[in-house]
Amino acid sequence: MLTLRERQINAIKQMLNLNSQQPKALAAEPVWKILIYDRVGQDIISPIISIKELRELGVTLHVQLHSDRDSIPDVPAIYFCLPTDENLDRIQQDFSSGLYDVYHLNFLAPITRSKIENLAAAALHAGCVANIHRVYDQYVNFISLEDDFFILKHQQSDQLSYYAINRANTRDEEMEALMDSIVDSLFALFVTLGNVPIIRCPRNSAAEMVARKLEKKLRENLWDARANLFHMDATQAGGGVFSFQRPVLLLLDRNMDLATPLHHTWSYQALVHDVLDLGLNLVYVEDETASAGARKKPKACDLDRNDRFWMTHKGSPFPTVAEAIQEELESYRNSEEEIKRLKTSMGIEGESDIAFSLVNDTTARLTNAVNSLPQLMEKKRLIDMHTKIATAILNFIKARRLDSFFEIEEKVMSKQTLDRPLLDLLRDGEFGQAEDKLRLYIIYFICAQQLPESEQERLKEALQAAGCDLTALAYVQRWKGIMNRSPSISQATQYEGGGTKTVSMFTKLVSQGSSFVMEGVKNLVVKRHNLPVTKITEQVMECRSNAETDDYLYLDPKLLKGGEVLPKNRAPFQDAVVFMVGGGNYIEYQNLVDFIKQKQTSNVQRRIIYGASTLTNARQFLKELSALGGEIQSPTATS
């Protein structure tokens, strides 16, 4: 069964094959073509199709729509962009300039009738109607970061951010446009999946606005005989991603949990995102190999599914990753030594001598070893890359005491007693950066049942002395007041935390042969626990009766008349799409991945796809909270 990511790749490959079925004989000579995309199209393609794969598909040139481009005759031009006025104006300009002989127009979202008529008029005026071969609505306007993780925007993601949804002075038409943008992308997602979901969401939230609009859009499409996109033949061969049973779409509002996005983390992928700004599966790390005095250039590191080490360890605790890198390095060195030893034992100096001695077992072993050299070199490249990334993370851990922050926050969330009073930690000049202390305090404030005013003031004074900007606290305080008055479960009881225990550091990592100097870093083992998003997902998938989730809306787009009443006899859901309106993070994603792994049995295969309007790390989220806090402190300053 194809994953979401694989189905999106297939849709884009079909588009690059000029919207005809991919030939089964891959050896067939591809049709050479040019790919022209806007920034949104680029963001969709870059995490899932490499430049090498584009070349294999016949794409000789890929360029930005709004860049200066020369005329290239006799080669099909594939456009992949949103049907915005700005983009359509540029396409019409290309028509007038006669840049290409053949145009294939592929829009990420459906183009309106009026816009297509304007485009046709421009083509007629430019005399290139015969040159336009295809115009397609592609329904792929989302970004697949993993097989089971997607976001809606990367560049200009602030348009769909937590701040954009919650700011005080958003006009009604702006909010409508924002919600429509989310709905259009979710609709495209389910067209790609080939399934119509049952929708659940909390009432009186941004999630409810999305849910009602999406239900309406799905229902209208299902009952339109000519335009129904959910027929088996209207999607890719093989039916929907989810088998037999329909999935549940659980729409959640970021307001349900502000602590997790600020939480210091300990798993590899989430750490890369938190401290190195991982974006679209690409991270930039300063090149330490630069010669002395030379300016260090950031080196791009691609973290994709072809990287076996990444796929195995992205969810692992950092010390486990460091140990695994060390083991991989030792394995590589052993393989290298084996080749050298075999060559020496046979008296072989160069590659040319091998041909004269293909007579015995030793030679056969050497031939196999030499043939495996390309794989060995690729293994070495990946080891070097992950050593570079892990070293950069380790430097941050030591400089900012990230291991201690993670350990303390886990204790705060699981209501354990801290070894040192929080006030002492915040006053400690050598304990982390100002941003780290502010994150810790906000989590402490959110998780505390009652925090006396006098204690709050002392803690705030310590934060200010540490150089913290407290603007975000104005918003967090207002948010907590509203959440405490809501009928749903109190925020203070939502968090359970797992707690941690410190075990002795791996001996391999403190030996002199290690690439990593791990002294002073705690080897924390985290007790498995469910975050708020995972707890709600479990309750909804299991159809368990719960005061909070029983009140969630229940919408079924397949019903001619929309009903909101829970059916009495409900079977548990095997598959779920969990979508966070207002921004998600790798911490929640990894928690859901770990949860669903535990739920797998030999008889039942369950799947969860996690998605979010945007992907933010703690620094970015704190910035959004500060912007919202600034509006509260000086409302007249906002326009």
UniProtKB/Swiss-Prot annotation:
The keyword Membrane applies. The keyword Transmembrane does not apply. One of its GO terms (cellular component) is Golgi membrane. Residues 85-500 are annotated as: 4 X approximate repeats. InterPro entries: Sec-1-like_dom1 (IPR043154), Sec-1-like_dom3a (IPR043127), Sec1-like (IPR001619), Sec1-like_dom2 (IPR027482), Sec1-like_sf (IPR036045). GO terms for biological process: endoplasmic reticulum to Golgi vesicle-mediated transport; intracellular protein transport; post-Golgi vesicle-mediated transport; regulation of ER to Golgi vesicle-mediated transport; response to hypoxia; response to toxic substance; retrograde vesicle-mediated transport, Golgi to endoplasmic reticulum; vesicle-mediated transport. It holds the Pfam family Sec1. In embryos, from stage 14, expression is seen in posterior midgut, esophagus and salivary glands. No expression is seen in larval imaginal disks. It comes from the Eukaryota. Keywords: Cytoplasm, Membrane, Repeat. Sequence repeats lie at residues 85-121, 203-245, 423-460, 464-500. Belongs to the STXBP/unc-18/SEC1 family. This is Protein sly1 homolog. It comes from Drosophila melanogaster (Fruit fly). The gene is Slh.
